[in-house]
Amino acid sequence: MVYFPKIEKIKYEGTNTKNMYAFRHYNSEEIIMGKTMKEHLRFAVAYWHTMTQDGSDPFGKAVNKRSWLGESPMETAKKRVIAFFEILEKLDVEYFCFHDIDIAPEGNSLKEFFSNIDEITDLIKEKMDETGIKLLWNTANMFSNPRYVNGAASTNNANVYAIAAAQVKKGLDVSKKLGGENYVFWGGREGYETLLNTDMKFEQDNIARLFKMAIFYGEKIGHKPQFLIEPKPKEPSKHQYDFDAATTMAFILKYGLEKDFKLNLEANHATLAGHTFEHELNVARNYGALGSIDANQGDVLLGWDTDEFPTNVYDVTLAMYEILENGGIEPGGINFDSKVRRSSFEMEDLLLAHIAGMDTFARGLKSAMKLKEDRFFEDLKEQRYSSFKKGIGAKIISGKENLESLTNYALKNDEPIIESSHIEYVKNILNDYLY
């Protein structure tokens, strides 16, 4: 069955096009700094928002029109696979991502759930072999089922912990089966409501134990994806242990996981943590731990995870600059963890929304390339920190100074002359680079 019969494969037509179903900026084969746009951006489509989100919210029922709903959960699951790969092919997107419960119904037992996963991943593998589309990453949903009300790896119930471990094992088996390049952990329930009844160290020790089990099992089955942790400060938990990039890096380093784990960073999660997206990317990059990103945007006027499709060229430009500074993001990618707005309920809105996101990242990539070619930020920073290139500054950097010698220097010299940073001018010039 064809689900989008009136929509052809999306092609690049430039900014003068009147065709809704065309890329205005994303030209997959355009060469940017020695690589094609497709190689730089490594786009992925998220199975959950694309295939399972129905448009309902706490105040209203489902509104999304979807023609792949079947008479049984397994029939719906199979139809979703066919429709999903049609979307991927029409967008010419090479990668996809999913949680286990996105693709297969849980059924009435863990055994039935795993059997359903096996059947659906057989179909997914057929479509992957047929199309050449690849799995960027998969993960286990260990936050939706009521059993995880007190956490998965951080739970107070050992039997729940065992089920979480079983889901991770199955997830890694599926990752090997489908050739997954990364494997993600997101701890939506790994946190606490109150410290009154919480042993934080015990819970974090147990989370680390599960991560080490995952590393060991991957090695045992001969499959070594890049493991990724996705930070988020809150929602659904009041206080999540993977609060932001810096907090998560502290966890990774404390438990000696840095050889196997990097970060999967989401723009909207940065907003919830009180950071810009480029801040989170910069922190991860400085640790050598920028692994992959979830592309979306939040609404700074709202206090929850809105997961809007990214259309802010300014923010995306600064994000792409960090990725270029990182030398790229492979084997990670740019996964659209984004959902259409409730009023965008037609099936074709799924394609239009991804076109918008892909065009925005293409513009951000070109803007970031120009910034790098002109050394815009590099020259600014070199000038700003120039006092450390010579004289006493160079001696400080080389380790030749100490508190006593610097005190003597300070006492012999006049009060330093402080220079303006001209921030408003810098921001004004930055606007000239936005395509």
UniProtKB/Swiss-Prot annotation:
It is found in: Cytoplasm. This is Xylose isomerase. Signal peptide: none annotated. Its EC number is 5.3.1.5. Gene3D superfamilies: Divalent-metal-dependent TIM barrel enzymes. GO terms for cellular component: cytoplasm. It comes from the Bacteria. Mg(2+) 2 binds at E266, H269, D305, D307. The gene is xylA. One of its GO terms (molecular function) is xylose isomerase activity. Disulfide bonds: none annotated. Keywords: Carbohydrate metabolism, Cytoplasm, Isomerase, Magnesium, Metal-binding, Xylose metabolism. HAMAP family: Xylose_isom_A. Belongs to the xylose isomerase family. It comes from Enterococcus faecalis (strain ATCC 700802 / V583). The active site is at H99, D102.
